[in-house]
């Protein structure tokens, strides 16, 4: 549920598979970092599943950070792609000018009807255009090793630049099982 959008879990799964497929078609490979600067919207949920389905590592950027810190994280995490909501396009646009790396980035704009029309676009294409090229039946594979990275998060950087913290599939699985047990699901 997001604004007027109603989507089943089957539809969400197909969209996650499309995202994974599209990322791989765009050259995103195992252990590549895909950064996202999104609020709690369907594309954020899809990224949490679709990015690992592509074998890539999700870097969910803190939406309250300044462009300088975002630029550092994009460089340090060696992001290969960035998916951005229009709400944060100005911050991302500025961060892109501050990057030290000259490596090209795949930039994808989410069109968020709840937020409104984008005043600024930073991407080469929209998220829906990107997904449309993907395969809803994409045959994704489980990680080959439970210690493979699933996410890259950053500390607050109170003693300098933020520090990258890598999460692995094993930790994500154990955390999910712990939640089921703790919440008596």
Model-based region annotation:
Residues 1-41, 45-49, 66-71, 128-129:
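Conserved AMP-binding/adenylate-forming core of the ANL superfamily
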